[in-house]
């Protein structure tokens, strides 16, 4: 599904004021907002809010209402953001990524794996997650921390993407796991990656558009849930996600910008989860909480 940018073009001063309006109305729900300079000499700026395509109509209506009092004369414009193969892009010229004992590498870098490292081979494909992004690397580091301190008997990787986190959990813990994604392409890619990494038993892959999927009930509740998604869906799904965590279990949350951390924490503290640790990487955070 495409991502949409709704934006208003104006001066720097007005863009800052509009950003404040956007922040008040959308940031708490996890929408990203931003300003950018377009033309320094002419003082042209854009204030933007980002959402998925199926949310555009609702967000645009709310934005128009929020801007009506002071900025109704400024039109709301839209841009459909390009769908980029981030896997291929992230692997261009990048060395293997090391996070704790894990090393995530492409097939061209197999010879760079050191003795004692847990190697995960992920090549360019159609699903997100090569370890180069701060969220994936943060999850790998946090997974190692959880494994050292808590007993884990089964794992859920929610929004598995390339399958890198599910594969990492299996290689480290050797316990049954369920890896789900709303995208059937991602599910297929993740399953293929698991086989390529020698994981032929113990991991189940399922396309699951929501928690009503029977896969969650069949394989859960889970001692460890890993969800590297985005702040807004993480907050929205908090009650259902927590319901699938076993008593005393853990959840690793990522896909969260540093400034969104407190909002996500509030959503899960509201479900009576306790914060254990936060890892900060390149403007992103990975959070560990327990039930």
Curated annotation (Swiss-Prot):
Swiss-Prot/TrEMBL keywords: Cytoplasm, Methyltransferase, S-adenosyl-L-methionine, Transferase
Reactions catalysed according to its record: L-lysyl-[protein] + 3 S-adenosyl-L-methionine = N(6),N(6),N(6)-trimethyl-L-lysyl-[protein] + 3 S-adenosyl-L-homocysteine + 3 H(+)
Record InterPro entries: Ribosomal_L11_MeTrfase_PrmA, Ribosomal_PrmA_MeTrfase, SAM-dependent_MTases_sf
Gene name per UniProt: prmA
Family to which the UniProt record says this protein belongs: Belongs to the methyltransferase superfamily. PrmA family.
Superkingdom in the source lineage: Bacteria
Name by which UniProt lists this protein: Ribosomal protein L11 methyltransferase
Lineage of source species: Bacteria, Pseudomonadati, Pseudomonadota, Alphaproteobacteria, Hyphomicrobiales
GO biological process, one term: methylation
Protein EC: 2.1.1.-
GO molecular function, one term: protein-lysine N-methyltransferase activity
